Curated annotation (Swiss-Prot):
<feature type="binding site">
    <location>
        <position position="204"/>
    </location>
    <ligand>
        <name>Mn(2+)</name>
    </ligand>
</feature>
<comment type="pathway">
    <text>Amino-acid biosynthesis; L-leucine biosynthesis; L-leucine from 3-methyl-2-oxobutanoate: step 1/4.</text>
</comment>
<feature type="binding site">
    <location>
        <position position="202"/>
    </location>
    <ligand>
        <name>Mn(2+)</name>
    </ligand>
</feature>
<dbReference type="GO" id="GO:0030145">
    <property type="term" value="F:manganese ion binding"/>
</dbReference>
<protein>
    <recommendedName>
        <fullName>2-isopropylmalate synthase</fullName>
        <ecNumber>2.3.3.13</ecNumber>
    </recommendedName>
</protein>
<keyword id="KW-0479">Metal-binding</keyword>
<keyword id="KW-0100">Branched-chain amino acid biosynthesis</keyword>
<dbReference type="GO" id="GO:0009098">
    <property type="term" value="P:L-leucine biosynthetic process"/>
</dbReference>
<keyword id="KW-0028">Amino-acid biosynthesis</keyword>
<comment type="function">
    <text>Catalyzes the condensation of the acetyl group of acetyl-CoA with 3-methyl-2-oxobutanoate (2-ketoisovalerate) to form 3-carboxy-3-hydroxy-4-methylpentanoate (2-isopropylmalate).</text>
</comment>
<feature type="binding site">
    <location>
        <position position="14"/>
    </location>
    <ligand>
        <name>Mn(2+)</name>
    </ligand>
</feature>
<keyword id="KW-0432">Leucine biosynthesis</keyword>
<dbReference type="InterPro" id="IPR000891">
    <property type="entry name" value="PYR_CT"/>
</dbReference>
<keyword id="KW-0963">Cytoplasm</keyword>
<dbReference type="InterPro" id="IPR002034">
    <property type="entry name" value="AIPM/Hcit_synth_CS"/>
</dbReference>
<feature type="region of interest" description="Regulatory domain">
    <location>
        <begin position="392"/>
        <end position="523"/>
    </location>
</feature>
<dbReference type="Pfam" id="PF08502">
    <property type="entry name" value="LeuA_dimer"/>
</dbReference>
């Protein structure tokens, strides 16, 4: 009988560390709800002690996610564990994940400590975490470079202290699959109480071996795999969860394990993470790349037409990729749009039908036919822009040519007031951005600009993603339109609204802090 492998997602913690701009609370919640829908068993959603923003994100997700166990990271430090517990206590059940380095190099040069002191600290902190929850995960940082005898000592002590999951990370992506499997097997041989905990693995892709190492560990007895959607993460990234999940499904014959994942949600979750994180998926990416199910060789095409199993070990439908694209027109009613969203697997809570239908009609008037990918793009943008807006693009006009200096005129609604400015620039997009900067006096510095076609043909929607720097912080913005100058302008307005909202949140936090201080003085 096959055993279950627990899927532990760290897209919102380890994965976010790869992003040029931090995600907002709303963006993190959107990803968390998608991960819950996909069926991940555990989701690590932040490092609460690191910032008030991370604390708020963890607390918000812990309050709303019900079907996945929410987890927060904490160093083996009292304050870390206490703050993690405080952020998670709104959940019915939660996990605290605490860690400390165990390799000789890390102990000597980073911690300036000894193995005995590390073990003593690990025991104390695991017990402290157990005061808050019966679900405690302990990680041996840099386990891949820790001598097996030392690693076994730490693991045995952590389990005796109450750790219910023991995580073995290949922190720097150093080990080979056969070597990593040997570490897991070695622990099963050396740790007498190992049956009292789940053995987990967390691999990095520095040598391109993250997925291979995780699967080798599963074959050797690990029963939890940690990773991120699309493999995002520090340096070369984390283990790609979608690849591990589908490998377990496709090669059940040799691994004899299974997951509780809803495979039909893989593709949509992957796309959402890509869009929100502004990290395009390479065409040749396994499982979710646009070429993953494409066949260009004549021999392959002939074989697939005769029997798909000749060259396909899984189907697009098995990951929720519906290749039949139906089109709607401006004559399609609200019910038709809702029906199509239902067929694509969207719940009404995931989008605002009124806003989506209004955007659909405007797009249908421009391009005639609206396809599935158009609807998904409109729903995504609508979700991003549901929060209150201080800035709104009222009007823009650009003039440019091969021998002319680009000029833009922009009207921007700023609260209740509409302001207008004109500016020149190095091209129409730059001219629009210069005009917007004049209106707001924010002096936003553009760090990254990317344009992605959503759909096919000359009338495809253009999605612009930008990262901008303001007062030492980076903010992400996204815009969508058939006109790339318009989508560029919308992306910058989205950035401005994110800056404004961040300032409002900061004011509210200061107000609460002052209120608490006043209450202390009264007492």
């Amino acid at each position: 009988m096959s055993q279950q492998v627990i899927i532990f997602d760290t897209t919102l913690r380890d994965g976010e560390q790869a992003l040029q701009a931090s995600l907002s609370v709303k963006e993190k919640l959107q990803i968390a709800l998608a991960l819950e829908r996909m069926g991940v068993d555990v989701m690590e959603v932040g490092f609460p002690v690191s910032s008030p923003g991370d604390f708020e994100s963890v607390q918000t997700i812990a309050r709303q996610v019900k079907n996945s166990r929410v987890c927060a990271l904490a160093r083996c430090v009292e304050k870390d564990i206490d703050v993690a517990a405080e952020s998670l206590k709104v959940a019915e059940a939660f996990r605290i994940h605490t860690f400390i380095a165990t390799s000789p190099m890390h102990i000597a040069t980073k911690l300036r400590s000894t193995l005995d002191e590390v073990i003593e600290r690990a025991i104390y902190m695991v017990k402290r975490a157990r005061n808050y929850t019966d679900d405690v995960e302990f990680s041996c940082e840099d386990a891949g470079r820790t001598p097996i005898a030392d690693l076994a000592r730490v693991v045995e002590a952590a389990i005796n202290a109450g750790a219910t999951t023991i995580n073995i990370p290949d922190t720097v992506g150093y080990t080979m699959p056969f070597e990593f499997a040997g570490i897991i097997s070695g622990l099963y041989e050396r740790v007498p109480n190992i049956d009292k905990a789940i053995i987990s693995v967390h691999t990095h892709d520095d040598l391109g071996l993250a997925v291979g190492n995780s699967l080798a560990a599963v074959h050797a007895g690990a029963r939890q795999v940690e990773g991120a959607m699309n493999g995002i993460g520090e340096r070369a990234g984390n283990c790609s969860l979608e690849e591990v999940i589908m490998a377990i499904k496709v090669r059940k014959d040799i691994l004899n394990v299974h997951t509780a994942i809803n495979h039909q949600e893989i593709w949509r979750t992957s796309q959402l993470v890509s869009q929100i994180c502004n990290m395009p998926i390479p065409a040749n990416k396994a499982i979710v790349g646009s070429s993953a199910f494409a066949h260009s060789s004549g021999i392959h095409q002939d074989g697939v037409l005769k029997n798909r199993e000749n060259y396909e070990i899984m189907t697009p439908e098995s990951i929720g990729l519906n290749q039949i694209q139906l089109n709607l027109t401006s004559r399609s009613g609200r019910a038709a749009v809702k029906h199509r969203m239902d067929e694509m697997g969207y719940k009404e809570s995931e989008y605002n039908l009124d806003n989506l239908y209004d955007a659909f009609l405007k797009l249908a008037d421009k391009k005639g036919q609206v396809f599935d990918y158009d609807l998904e793009a409109l729903a995504f943008i609508g979700k991003q822009q549901e929060e209150p807006e201080h800035f709104r693009l009222d009007y823009f006009s650009v003039q440019s040519g091969s021998n002319d200096i680009a000029t833009a005129a922009v009207k921007l609604a700023c609260g209740e007031e509409v302001k207008a400015e004109a500016a020149n620039g190095n091209g129409p997009v730059d001219a629009v951005y210069q005009a917007i900067n004049r209106i707001t006096d924010y002096n936003v510095e553009l760090v990254k600009y990317s344009l992605t076609a959503k759909g096919h043909g000359k009338d495809a929607l253009g999605q612009v993603d930008i990262v901008a720097n303001y007062n030492g912080r980076r903010f992400h913005g996204v815009g969508l339109a058939t006109d790339i100058v318009e989508s560029s302008a919308k992306a910058m307005v989205h950035v401005l609204n994110n800056i404004w909202r961040a300032a409002e949140v900061e004011k509210e936090l200061q107000r609460k802090a002052q209120h608490n201080e006043n209450n202390k003085e009264t007492v």
